[in-house]
């Protein structure tokens, strides 16, 4: 006669906690297994990492061609001459915030061509 899962669960449910502990120990010895829960390793945490979708373009340093960098900042941001100069003089400054990867790379390329040192964050 074969027992169903429901019958086994019902039988275990009628036992005391001590009897269940003894049953678990007997099953571990009989089948050569342990009832310990395996801990998740660092590989599981690494799988959750998502690709960044929004970037900030940070002007780290204007470099030697400051006038060209000011022009590039004006073109990218739409700022006036005074505001663009203040942003360049105050480096490091965020030039573009929350932009797509493509837009951030384009802005970085334009600023670097103008002579600036730029980072994407």
From Swiss-Prot:
GO molecular function per UniProt: mRNA binding; structural constituent of ribosome
Cellular-component GO terms for this entry: cytosolic large ribosomal subunit
Listed GO biological process terms: translation
InterPro entries for the chain: Ribosomal_bL12 (IPR000206), Ribosomal_bL12_C (IPR013823), Ribosomal_bL12_C/ClpS-like (IPR014719), Ribosomal_bL12_oligo (IPR008932), Ribosomal_bL12_oligo_N_sf (IPR036235)
Keyword field: Ribonucleoprotein, Ribosomal protein
Coiled-coil portions: none
Transmembrane keyword on record: no
Record SUPFAM superfamilies: ClpS-like, Ribosomal protein L7/12, oligomerisation (N-terminal) domain
The keyword Ribonucleoprotein is assigned to this record: yes
HAMAP family assigned to the protein according to its UniProt record, in alphabetical order: Ribosomal_bL12 (MF_00368)
Assembly and oligomerization: Homodimer. Part of the ribosomal stalk of the 50S ribosomal subunit. Forms a multimeric L10(L12)X complex, where L10 forms an elongated spine to which 2 to 4 L12 dimers bind in a sequential fashion. Binds GTP-bound translation factors.
Functional description taken from the UniProt entry: Forms part of the ribosomal stalk which helps the ribosome interact with GTP-bound translation factors. Is thus essential for accurate translation.
Family that this chain belongs to: Belongs to the bacterial ribosomal protein bL12 family.
Protein name as catalogued: Large ribosomal subunit protein bL12
Phylogenetic placement of the source organism: Bacteria, Pseudomonadati, Pseudomonadota, Gammaproteobacteria, Pseudomonadales
């Amino acid at each position: 006669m074969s027992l169903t899962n429901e019958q086994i669960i019902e039988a275990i449910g009628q036992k005391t906690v001590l009897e269940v502990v003894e049953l678990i120990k007997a099953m571990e010895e009989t089948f050569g297994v342990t009832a310990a829960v395996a801990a998740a390793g660092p590989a599981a945490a690494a799988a959750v990492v998502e690709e960044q979708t929004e970037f900030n373009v940070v002007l780290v340093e204007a470099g030697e061609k400051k006038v060209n960098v000011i022009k590039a900042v004006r073109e990218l941001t739409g700022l006036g001459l005074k505001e663009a100069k203040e942003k360049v003089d105050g480096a490091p400054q965020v030039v573009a915030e929350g932009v797509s990867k493509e837009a951030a790379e384009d802005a970085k390329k334009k600023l670097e061509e103008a002579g600036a040192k730029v980072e994407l964050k």
